[in-house]
Amino acid sequence: MRILFNHNISGAADLIDLMRRAQPGLHVIATHERRDTPIALAADRLLPEPAETRLMSPDAYADWLLQVALAEGAELVLPYRRREELAGFRDWFSARGIRLLTASDSNTMGFLEEKPAFLSRMEAAGVPVTPFRRFEGADEYGRLRGEGELFPDHPGPLCVKPASGIYGAGFRIIRDELPAMTPLSGLSALELPDVAFQALLGALHRPEPMMLMPFLEGPERSVDFSCHEGRLLGTVTRIKAGTSQRLLHDTYGEELARFVAQTFRLTGILNLQTIEDTAGTQRLMEVNTRASGGIGMTGLTDVNLPALFLDSIAGVRSDLPARVTGEVQAGRRELFWGV
């Protein structure tokens, strides 16, 4: 099989390695803006994705990617960049004998990436979610804080994060008061005094939708899962443990992944995240319509999520989702190579 990836996060290199572990004859073509991407180590062929493609209209970009796929003889296209838009052009690709697979249609993916809307939908369905209040800009934030105790069931510090985004960009822990004589070096990069956060909001010319939440300090789980047309194929749960992560089977994580996949009829190697509150309840934080940056760690278990996905689109699947046996603790190190 010949697969084309467009511009992607570096974790796609691990995704490709896991696919090739199951299918050694796989031929992978990747387009990317940078020559120094780790994907260059995993792909058979790396092609430039010019920066100007960012400025293309949706149909122009879809046509550009289609022409690359045709020129390279790709049978399957798995997009990351502009995937929400590309979902609307799947018929263009299928008309030329190429499968373009996205997590869902454009509207559904957009909905899933908007955390407040998604969490409200899940809460209405009975799923425990992280409590939140949505706001935009300094004035709305100030009004929220003026309401007093916003989350009485979850006392303690508050935190904020953008309503959409990846890698925790924009996440901050808000400190209403700092201990006396606290030096700047005594704060983590994620901590902000409330007065500093309000000043920062006031300095921004374009406020973005954000979420104000209780800062829950329980175990955080990242559930990587593979699914095809709403059917769950397998899961691997990762629990952060200091500088390493524990990889194992989590029954609730599997149930949640199955529910999300079925509800939105999802396809792909995707990810969801939960965090425990003080009562030990796992609360859903978000779902990602892409593979996580930590997908490579799942290769240390006996469940190969990318392989399950490739098998399923070829018509080969099990009646039950694959489950990790045992537990693995994963560390990581930097990788260097000459470009």
What are these regions (language model features)?
Residues 1-105:
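ATP-binding N-terminal substructure of ATP-dependent carboxylate-amine bond-forming enzymes
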Residues 6, 241-255, 259-339:
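ATP-dependent carboxylate activation and anion-phosphoryl transfer catalytic cores
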Residues 8-12, 82-84, 135-140, 216-218:
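Short beta->alpha connector loops
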Residues 39-41, 56-59, 108-116, 168-169, ...:
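Short, charged, surface-exposed secondary-structure boundary motifs
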Residues 109-209:
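Active-site nucleotide/adenylate-binding loops and adjacent lid/helix of ATP-dependent enzymes
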Residues 184-264, 275-283:
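Phosphate-binding site of ATP-dependent enzymes
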